[in-house]
A protein has these predicted regions:
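Flexible cofactor-recognition loop at the NAD(P)H-binding site
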Residues: 16, 38-39, 95-108, 156-157
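Canonical Rossmann dinucleotide-binding motif of NAD(H)/NADP(H)-dependent dehydrogenases/reductases
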Residues: 3-40
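Catalytic loop of short-chain dehydrogenase/reductase
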Residues: 102-106, 114-120, 144, 148-188, ...
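A short, exposed helix-loop element centered on a Lys and neighboring polar residues
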Residues: 136-137, 180
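A glycine-rich helix->loop->beta "capping" turn
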Residues: 62-65, 85-98, 104, 117, ...
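Active-site Tyr-X3-Lys motif and surrounding loop/helix of classical short-chain dehydrogenase/reductase
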Residues: 81-88, 107-126
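Conserved amphipathic alpha-helix within the SDR
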Residues: 56, 60, 67-70, 76-91
């Protein structure tokens, strides 16, 4: 039994870590899974292990169908093109896993606010928060054409506890609020929007 057979899913940030794991499980459940990332075979970001092509191979090894689309979600035209590709090839989108977080390039330094570079804001809010926001902006019109749909944002949240890094805390809580706001705005469209915190992962 494949509970997601016939469903179309998009997982952003699918090269490694949570994005890869989610994409693989969606594939196992029968969904056709599009995944985006900057790391492709032969050109991995920062030479880190894992690419979207590797994720496709893992999905296919489990009997699923995966489609890799190279995308830098800080570039709106690339993000828009991903959604256009899904519309053209599938005619719909049922599930959006908004997992992109380009701030891995910067890392999370455990320093007081006044010792941190303002680059933390630029990176975490551009490659993290805005990247997820832009993906929603382009994907929601397609999701709204369904009778029902699902958006999941991956983030880091621990019952209002401070994460220990000023900019990281701001960015991750912004994503939680993004999910909350969208859940209210999209309720009439029967689109569920959730923020999921799998815990801190350095991937």
């Amino acid at each position: 039994m494949k509970p997601l057979k016939g469903k179309i899913a998009l997982v952003t940030g699918g090269s490694r870590g949570a994005g890869r794991a989610i994409a693989v499980e969606l594939g196992k459940a029968g969904a056709t899974v599009y995944m985006t990332g900057r790391s492709i075979r032969g050109a991995s970001t920062n030479q880190w292990p894992g690419t979207i092509d590797d994720t496709v191979s893992q999905i296919e090894a489990s009997g699923g169908k995966g489609i890799a689309v190279r995308c830098d979600h800080t570039n709106d035209s690339e993000t828009e093109a991903v959604i256009a590709k899904i519309r053209e090839e599938q005619g719909k989108l049922d599930i959006l896993i908004n997992n992109v977080w380009g701030a891995h390039d910067l890392g999370v330094e455990a320093k007081p606010f006044w010792e941190l570079s303002l680059k933390n804001w630029d990176t975490m809010f551009t490659a993290g928060v805005r990247a997820q926001l832009a993906t929603n902006h382009f994907a929601v019109p397609l999701l709204r054409e369904n009778k029902q749909a699902l958006i999941i944002h991956t983030t880091f949240w621990d019952e209002n506890k401070y994460t220990g890094q000023f900019y990281y805390d701001l960015a991750k809580n912004a994503i939680v609020r993004m999910a909350y706001g969208l859940s209210l705005e999209l309720k009439r469209d029967n689109i569920a929007v959730l923020a999921v915190s799998p815990g801190f992962m350095r991937t």
